[in-house]
Swiss-Prot record:
One of its GO terms (biological process) is electron transport coupled proton transport. NDH-1 shuttles electrons from an unknown electron donor, via FMN and iron-sulfur (Fe-S) centers, to quinones in the respiratory and/or the photosynthetic chain. The immediate electron acceptor for the enzyme in this species is believed to be plastoquinone. Couples the redox reaction to proton translocation, and thus conserves the redox energy in a proton gradient. Cyanobacterial NDH-1 also plays a role in inorganic carbon-concentration. It is found in: Cellular thylakoid membrane. The keyword Transmembrane helix does not apply. Its main location: membrane. It catalyses: a plastoquinone + NADH + (n+1) H(+)(in) = a plastoquinol + NAD(+) + n H(+)(out); a plastoquinone + NADPH + (n+1) H(+)(in) = a plastoquinol + NADP(+) + n H(+)(out). This is NAD(P)H-quinone oxidoreductase subunit K 1. Binds 1 [4Fe-4S] cluster.
């Protein structure tokens, strides 16, 4: 007598953890998209070095074989459109401020800034009597890591990069837009007195500047208004 096989019941969503074959247990990594995104960014920071003073000389030792700047995945770039890290080292003056802001605006998001040296952070020794030094680069662009020193050692630069990598690793994709830094320029006064402009154009508009000197005009044979008036009177009398 032939009997039909009894179909055993099977749970669609079992409580127990699914079994992974042995050949796949060592080839699967479980992670989140946010962790992969942060890992890719912190392992490939491409800096744009904006050196203006003696602090930038420390990068010569940083790039050398003793400290090996490239082992952190840092590849210096010449174009701001290819960089995601801006390192400012040295004094920032009023004349250079627009260029620095333009470089920062040309960098793609997400982008980070390391302020290196006392002159970049507070103006340094130029903060007391210099009429052109900016008292802190954070009044122009937002800063993520402050690196004090005059100048900072290469070990301090490495520590700043490690701290920046930790900050990038703790960021979340959904919170990136809510963690934008506030611009300190709107809340902190620059502390500089406004001075009336020296070149107002009045000197060039003076009557003595409208006509060449008499000696020069006589040497070149140019007609002088005074001589023309005397000659005109002589002609009228005759």
């Amino acid at each position: 007598m032939n009997t039909l096989p009894v179909k055993q019941s099977q749970l669609i969503n079992p409580i127990a953890a699914p079994e992974v074959p042995q050949e796949l247990q060592e080839n699967i990594i479980l992670t989140s998209l946010n962790d992969v995104y942060s890992w890719c960014r912190l392992s490939s920071l491409w800096p744009l070095m904006y050196g203006t003073a003696c602090c930038f000389i420390e990068f010569a030792a940083m790039i050398g074989s003793r400290f090996d700047f490239d082992r952190f995945g840092l590849v210096p770039r010449c174009s701001p459109r290819q960089a995601d890290l801006l390192i400012t080292a040295g004094t920032i003056t009023m004349k250079m401020a627009p260029a620095l802001v333009k470089l920062y605006e040309q960098m793609p998001e997400p982008k980070y800034v390391i302020a290196m040296g006392a002159c970049t952070i507070t103006g340094g020794m130029f903060s007391t009597d210099s009429p052109t030094a900016v008292r802190g680069v954070d009044k122009l662009i937002p800063v993520d890591i402050y690196l004090p020193g005059c100048p900072p050692r290469p070990e301090a630069i490495m520590d700043a990069i490690v701290k920046l990598r930790k900050k990038i690793g703790n960021e979340h994709l959904d919170e990136r837009g809510q963690l934008q830094q506030t611009h300190r320029f709107h809340s902190v006064k620059h502390g500089m007195k406004s001075v009336a402009p020296i070149l107002t154009g009045e000197y060039l508009a003076a009557p003595t500047r409208q006509a060449p000197p008499q000696q020069l005009a006589e040497a070149l044979g140019l007609p002088l208004p005074a001589l023309e008036a005397i000659e005109k009177e002589a002609v009228e009398r005759n």
